[in-house]
A protein has these predicted regions:
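Extracytoplasmic "Venus flytrap"
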Residues: 38-57, 81-87, 109-110, 180-189, ...
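Extracytoplasmic ligand/sensor domains, especially the bilobed periplasmic-binding protein
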Residues: 102-210, 261-285
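Extracellular/periplasmic periplasmic-binding protein-like sensory domains
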Residues: 251-324, 336-341, 383, 394-423
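Beta-alpha junction/loop-to-helix N-cap segments that form part of ligand/metal-binding clefts
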Residues: 49-54, 69-140, 152, 212-220, ...
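N-terminal export signals
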Residues: 7-28
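Signal peptide-proximal N-terminal region
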Residues: 56-78, 200-205
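C-terminal segment of N-terminal export signals and the immediately downstream linker at the start
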Residues: 23-43
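Segments of small-molecule ligand-sensing domains
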Residues: 310-320, 331-400, 423-424
Length: 424
């Protein structure tokens, strides 16, 4: 099985729900002992670069927090495991909880993996704070009221924002629309959201082509030829893995982008690989919850970006923010619960304290809703190649809150998108 960020593979394996009795983390822990936090993230494969970016960020965050007293006076000790397929990742999650005795587990990028891991976390009464994983099957929330599981913003936020910015920046400038999107639920739902938003704003456009390459396809010439033959004047693509730079490079060589507007709502995952030499100007370019070059960046973001670029010689993307946000909200929850109870809190007490606590993350302020789904700040805008880097930045920055881009608790996504008050 190939790992994808938004795969929604249904997991019915025998290992998904163990027969072991639920366990409680004992609160009577030596207060000077290190606080062990498990990290599960991909380190290879199609999502490997994303996982590495998140791991680097959480290591930076832990070091910074430890210099300031750690979490409630305890130094943070990270225990890192790799996210791969659902079965193996669930086994590693159990090892972190049962053998390593971590106090919480953070990470997970693939929704296919997180759908399998989340029920295990509930069973084990173990805190799980996801970076980019959800418990959505397509657009349907499968775990509306978890006790211990905290999820990322909804899968579709970046597509909703990119679609709205296509309306804002390109309305009246295109008539023929094509899409090339990954062939699984994330790509198909993003494409449908784009179509519905155009319809809602009364934009009359002909949809002239749809291409559905499998994730990881590195020869996209046939897809590019089909797109070019359709003669679109706007192309929408929610590609975000290593195939996106390949598509842009091969499309440029074929002359696909000449006179064509583009919407790439998740492009920043591949930021460092999207070189100016094959990237046209003016793309609606999605940075999700962290734009590394923001002109009004916080002191926290500036410090992180400087350290990151000095050490790794590349720019960080939104997975860094997701990793920092997870640790920051966990820290806030532990300290709030300890203050309220007067002793080291149980995972249940931390889970009860975390929703609603606003923290400063790398990309701005964020919080978890009562249903334990994140609300953060999203950044996109038209791209420019007029900068000091070898990849595009944003000519102007559009900023939306997640509350403007994702359905409220209990809502149906497709009904919400028809009636919600939109920020454009």
């Amino acid at each position: 099985m190939k790992l994808t960020r938004r795969d929604f593979t249904k997991l019915a394996g025998a290992g998904m729900l163990a027969a072991a009795a639920p366990r409680l983390f004992g609160p009577a822990i030596a207060q000077n002992a290190p606080l062990k936090v498990g990290i599960i993230a991909p380190r290879s494969g199609v999502a490997g670069t994303a996982g590495e970016c998140g791991i680097r960020a959480v290591q930076w965050a832990a070091e910074r927090m430890n210099k300031d007293g750690g979490i409630a006076g305890r130094k943070i000790e990270l225990v890192v495991e790799e996210e791969t397929n659902p079965k193996d990742t669930i086994e590693r999650f159990r090892r972190l909880v049962l053998q390593e005795k971590v106090q919480s587990v953070h990470g997970l990028i693939s929704t296919g993996v997180s759908l399998g891991t989340a029920p295990v976390a509930e069973e084990e009464q173990a805190l799980l704070v996801m970076w980019d994983g959800t418990t959505q099957d397509g657009v349907k929330e499968m775990m509306p009221n978890p006790k211990y599981v905290f999820r990322s913003t909804d899968n579709e936020c970046e597509a909703v924002m990119g679609s709205l910015l296509a309306v804002k920046h390109f309305k009246g400038k295109f008539k023929r629309v094509a899409g090339i999107n990954p062939d699984y639920s994330y790509g198909r739902n993003n494409w449908e959201a784009f179509r519905q938003i155009l319809a809602r704003y009364g934009i009359e456009a002909e949809f002239v082509a749809e291409q559905w390459p499998k994730v990881g396809t590195m020869d996209l010439t046939s897809h590019i030829a089909a797109l070019k033959a359709a003669k679109p004047d706007l192309i929408f693509s929610s590609m975000l893995f290593a195939d996106l730079p390949v598509f842009m490079k091969q499309g440029h060589a074929a002359g696909l982008f000449e006179g064509v507007k583009m919407v790439l709502p998740a492009a920043a995952w591949q930021l460092n690989q999207l070189k100016k030499e094959f990237m046209p100007e003016g793309i609606i370019f999605g940075h999700n919850t962290l734009y590394f070059d923001h002109p009004q960046a916080s002191a926290l973001q500036k410090a992180f970006v400087q350290d990151y670029m000095d050490q790794y010689k590349e720019a960080p993307h939104w997975e860094a923010d997701r990793a920092y946000f997870a640790l920051a909200t966990y820290k806030a929850g532990v300290e709030a619960a300890q203050k309220a109870g007067g002793k080291w809190p149980t995972p249940e007490q931390v889970a009860e304290a975390m929703p609603g606590l606003e923290v400063e993350s790398l990309g701005g302020k964020g919080r978890f809703r009562k249903d334990k789904i994140a609300e953060q700040v999203f950044y996109q805008g038209p791209s420019t190649n007029a900068n000091k880097y070898d990849f595009p930045t944003l000519a102007s920055v559009d900023t939306f809150q997640a509350s403007q881009l994702q359905k409220p608790p209990g809502a149906d996504f497709w009904e919400w998108i028809k009636t919600a008050k939109m920020p454009v």
